[in-house]
Amino acid sequence: MATSLQAPILGSRPPRRTLRFLSFALFSALVLVVASFSSRKSESGSGLRSGSVEPEYAWTNQMLTWQRAGFHFRTVKNYMNDPSGPMYYKGWYHLFYQHNPNYAYWGDISWGHAVSRDLLNWFHLPVAVKPDRWYDIYGVWTGSITVMPDDGRVVMLYTGGTKEKYQIMSVAMAADPSDPLLVEWVKYDEVNPVLRPPPGIGLTDFRDPNPIWYNTTDSTWQLVIGSKNDSLQHTGIAMVYTTKDFINLTLLPGVLHSVDHVGMWECVDLFPVASSGPLIGRGLDRSMMLADNVKHVLKASMNDEWHDYYAIGSYDVATHRWVPDDESVDVGIGMRIDWGKFYASRTFYDPVKERRVMWGYVGETDSGDADVAKGWASFQGIPRTVLFDVKTGTNVLTWPIEEVESLRMTRKDFSDIVVNKGSTVELHVGDANQLDIEAEFEMDKDALETAIEADIGYNCSSSGGAVSRGVLGPFGLFVLANQDLTELTATYFYVSRATDGSLHTHLCHDEMRSSKANDIVKRVVGGTFTVLDGELLSLRILVDHSIVESFAQGGRTSATSRVYPTEAIYERARVFLFNNATGATITAKAVKVWQMNSTSNQYYPFTSSN
């Protein structure tokens, strides 16, 4: 075990009146106060700042170079956002993505394209499609790719932006379906655009087509498109179309689902998950939509607030309607895919490992000038598997794909470290810029049973972060921290008491001290999750330079941050355990820390064989 350094943590608050303890951790969702964008499709990628404009920080080349991730998906250069058309095809994983091939900011949006054998090491291919027709001159935006079961054609259906910024659907096809790399794509000018917004839908509120089911009986696809209806109650909606060829499409009556007061839905996804029986632990192809013991996850990205929500329910393919199991946690008002900087997620089925894999992009929160100086902007989050949580029966589990573990190198183990109230313990792990951390925590049981303080209405975003002291939290880890803890990113648990006396457990990310720069967005984000009787609190953290991803309780919830330290970089980055609770001692039962290898990220060597 490493030598410990214990020091008081600054920041405190007076104790509150309390309620009697009843039970541990029930699921709830917290609404964070965030800045909203008027339209994601014209987003600059620079983040939003409140109040007066801060002067730009004097970034050095050394600082900017450090920010580049080592094992997350990244472009070779320039701007990236939404993942599009992920798939496995003829021995290669493909990822298409929204991309500005010319500059490190939003604009000239095209489909970037990369391939991999393992979802970690990537070859970048030529841009698949560019905005060069009247029907997509403002941007080739998010869409999907489908392999036709009858003749093997590979069809791209995408959202195009006209010069008026109207959103319409167009088709491109792989020029050579026998090419495993799918390098060349051909737009079908004679039929494009194949779809326009239907009556009642705004001309700029119609995007992100995604197939959800193939009916083998009549060889038709059902696909969803996201939108909103402001003539109702700022209602987010998903419409269902049918098609046999992705050229002739028919709108079905009604909508797949709608929720009032949540605004525009984009990047809608609907997929099956096994809820019981022999398929548990496996991802399901969309052909399993009608299988027994299957639930259906509806996910949508909320354009008003830039977060991805989901709900679990049932899809009736005959009526093309989806119904949530619990309306109180419907799409847009309940469960989040991730509480932080993670957006526009899209899943695909991996037939090789029989799993459903989710991609989501992680944008910048620094200044646009800093991105230009770096020459790139944004990452994709680590690809995650998605499974139904059979233990709770109420949520999904998202977890880093198993291939990530192949990047682990030197490992340090720590066990039974007691972290006293108001103290920190440094974990001497060596290079702390690329890490995979697994930790389990146990709280003093006497404190749980005797604590009577109430944190009524506690949520991470308005709590004051890791410096705010309560009886039962916060406690967790500081990563990307400097030695004197004046710069750090905190990922932690906080146990609070509700009005009924029950205890709720929160996973939070505190970015407020993550950088000494002022021209970046810094927030505290997070939400609650379920902890069952007998479970230790578990946390996995992936640290990859300026991106930090945390997963609690096996993936019941997660949070992602972009951070831009000025001092806690290179050899000056540190890791600490901390406990800022006023009424409980915390024991880190087991902490495992691996230094992580980097992945390759290069242009495809076309002089070699495929």
Curated annotation (Swiss-Prot):
Q: List the disulfide bonds.
A: C460-C508
Q: Which UniProt keywords apply?
A: Disulfide bond, Glycoprotein, Glycosidase, Hydrolase, Membrane, Signal-anchor, Transferase, Transmembrane, Transmembrane helix, Vacuole
Q: Which residues are glycosylated?
A: N215, N229, N248, N459, N580, N597
- Topological domains on the Cytoplasmic side lie at 1-20
Q: Where does substrate bind?
A: Y79, M80, N81, D82, Q98, W106, W141, T142, R207, D208, E266
Where in the cell?
Answer: Vacuole membrane
**GO terms of molecular function:** 6G-fructosyltransferase activity; hydrolase activity, hydrolyzing O-glycosyl compounds
Task: Cite the EC number.
Answer: 2.4.1.243
What is the pH dependence described in this protein's record? Optimum pH is 5.5. Stable between pH 5.0-6.0.
Record field: temperature dependence: Stable up to 37 degrees Celsius.
Domain of life of the organism in this record? Answer: Eukaryota
Q: Which Pfam families does the record associate with it?
A: Glyco_hydro_32C (PF08244), Glyco_hydro_32N (PF00251)
| Conditions for induction | Inhibited by Hg(2+), p-chloromercuribenzoate and Ag(+).
| Residues on Vacuolar side | 39-610
Q: How does it sit in the membrane?
A: Single-pass type II membrane protein
One GO BP annotation is: carbohydrate metabolic process
Q: Which GO terms describe its cellular component?
A: vacuolar membrane
Catalytic residues in the record: D82
Keyword check for RNA-binding, yes or no: no
Posttranslational modification, per the record? Answer: Might be processed in two N-terminal and C-terminal proteolytic fragments.
* Ranges annotated as spanning the membrane: 21-38
- Catalysed conversion reaction: [1-beta-D-fructofuranosyl-(2->1)-]m+1 alpha-D-glucopyranoside + [1-beta-D-fructofuranosyl-(2->1)-]n+1 alpha-D-glucopyranoside = [1-beta-D-fructofuranosyl-(2->1)-]m alpha-D-glucopyranoside + [1-beta-D-fructofuranosyl-(2->1)-]n+1 beta-D-fructofuranosyl-(2->6)-alpha-D-glucopyranoside (m > 0, n >= 0)
Function noted in UniProt = Involved in the synthesis of fructan of the inulin neoseries. Has no 1-FFT activity.
UniProt lists the family membership as follows: Belongs to the glycosyl hydrolase 32 family.
Q: What is this protein called?
A: 6(G)-fructosyltransferase
- Kindly list the organism's lineage: Eukaryota, Viridiplantae, Streptophyta, Embryophyta, Tracheophyta
